[in-house]
């Protein structure tokens, strides 16, 4: 089973690909102040970060084909801890959330990549647990 894990943070985006329990790609993409300054809102970073994730995977010689994609959970309404399937409603909730943080992009990027790969997207223990 091949799993892509995406963890967007305030100054980096971490990307890992696992084949079963073995990591086959582990990267931390650093974002400079200058890079992020071009975006007045966190949500404007969506395409930028998604492209970086996909480029990192391609540069490692891996296909964008996964059995599952998991993103860092965003700042949703308070919910119990656990694993959640990402859907369009969740993406909309995190994209339009009043509290913005880069982690909000995790479920959206996961959903977009998973949709293209034909697999499910998940988040685990969102930051509001």
Tell what function each PLM region has.
Residues 19-24, 64-65, 119:
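A generic structural motif
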Residues 9, 62, 115-117:
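Short, structurally constrained coil/turn elements
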Residues 3-44:
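Short glycine-rich, Thr/Ser-proximal phosphate-binding strand/loop in the N-terminal lobe
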Residues 30-65, 70:
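Conserved active-site "lid/cap" helical segment
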């Amino acid at each position: 089973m091949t799993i892509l894990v995406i963890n967007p943070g305030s100054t980096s985006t971490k990307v890992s690909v696992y084949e079963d329990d073995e990591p086959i790609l582990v990267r931390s993409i650093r974002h400079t102040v200058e890079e992020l300054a071009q975006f007045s809102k966190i949500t404007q970073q969506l395409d930028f970060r998604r492209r970086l994730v996909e480029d990192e995977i391609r540069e490692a010689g891996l296909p964008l084909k996964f059995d599952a994609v998991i993103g860092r959970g965003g700042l949703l309404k308070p919910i119990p801890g656990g694993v959640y399937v990402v859907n369009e409603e969740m993406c909309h909730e995190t994209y339009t959330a009043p509290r913005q943080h880069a982690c909000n992009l995790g479920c959206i990027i996961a959903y977009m990549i998973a949709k293209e790969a034909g697999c499910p997207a998940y988040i685990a223990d969102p930051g509001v647990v």
